[in-house]
């Protein structure tokens, strides 16, 4: 039995409340594959679903990678760690490729508003970034390049079409700066991008409308937290606090 769009959206909302994000993602994938432009609510449901689905694997991957490094003296344990990490990597890659296919086949093509276009291009940058975290060699270069390209395109549209206080423009600056810091190892560029986004938003705080006030100020706080972390002397810590945007 095929469900219509409103039933699938309702199913996604139920799954979100039950914290069953795989079900939520499957429902929103089916909505997207119907080929219509998504409403803001549907777009956010899709984003939240996949962010949680991929986030669980990214977190598992980090834990296992760290354990693997600590078991270097024990070959058997290390082999087990490696095999388990590769299993998680395969899941993570499948999820990212699913999202990237939805973006290229439906979402970016169907986006009529600049806001949607930026949202989806940012998402494309994010999921190529997640792929690059677990990639190596030539594959790593390709995913890094694709990520940067998507972020850059989104960034240019956002500067032209959106207020500096818009939560989507701020969220893009946040993640693009994390990309520079973590993936390209360019702390100067990361700090410059984050600082400019923060300063431009501060200068136009009076343009903030009530509905996005909370989202925008939360992302501004994350930008500032990352700047503090990145400019502090002990740069050994990961700057991944910059993933808390909506």
Curated annotation (Swiss-Prot):
Annotated GO MF terms: histone deacetylase binding; identical protein binding; phosphoserine residue binding; protein domain specific binding; protein kinase inhibitor activity; protein phosphatase inhibitor activity; protein sequestering activity; protein-containing complex binding
> Which residues are connected by disulfide bridges in this protein?
none
Entry-annotated residues carrying Phosphothreonine: 2
Signal peptide extent: none
A Gene Ontology biological process in which this protein takes part is: negative regulation of protein import into nucleus
Gene of origin? Ywhab
Localization of this protein:
Cytoplasm; Melanosome
Q: List the taxonomic lineage.
A: Eukaryota, Metazoa, Chordata, Craniata, Vertebrata
Protein's name in the database: 14-3-3 protein beta/alpha
């Amino acid at each position: 039995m095929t469900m219509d769009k409103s039933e699938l959206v309702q199913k996604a909302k139920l799954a979100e409340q039950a914290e069953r994000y795989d079900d939520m993602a499957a429902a929103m994938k089916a909505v997207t594959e119907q080929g219509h432009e998504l409403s803001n609510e549907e777009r956010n449901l899709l984003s939240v679903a996949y962010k949680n689905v991929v986030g669980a694997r990214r977190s598992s991957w980090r834990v296992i990678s760290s354990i693997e490094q600590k078991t270097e003296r024990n070959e058997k344990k290390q082999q087990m760690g490696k095999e388990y990490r590769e299993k998680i990597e395969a899941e993570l890659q499948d999820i990212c490729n699913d999202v990237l296919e939805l973006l290229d086949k439906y979402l970016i093509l169907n986006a009529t508003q600049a806001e949607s276009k930026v949202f989806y291009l940012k998402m494309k940058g994010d999921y190529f970034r997640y792929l690059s975290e677990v990639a190596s060699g030539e594959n790593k270069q390709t995913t890094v390049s694709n990520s940067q390209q998507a972020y850059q395109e989104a960034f240019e549209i956002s500067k032209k079409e959106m207020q500096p206080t818009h939560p989507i423009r701020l969220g893009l600056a946040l993640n693009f700066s994390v990309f520079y810091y973590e993936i390209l190892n360019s702390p100067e560029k990361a700090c410059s991008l984050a600082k400019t986004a923060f300063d431009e938003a501060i200068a136009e705080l009076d343009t903030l409308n009530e509905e996005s006030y909370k989202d925008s100020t939360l992302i501004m706080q994350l930008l500032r937290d990352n700047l503090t972390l990145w400019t502090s002397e002990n740069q050994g810590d990961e700057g991944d606090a910059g993933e808390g945007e909506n």
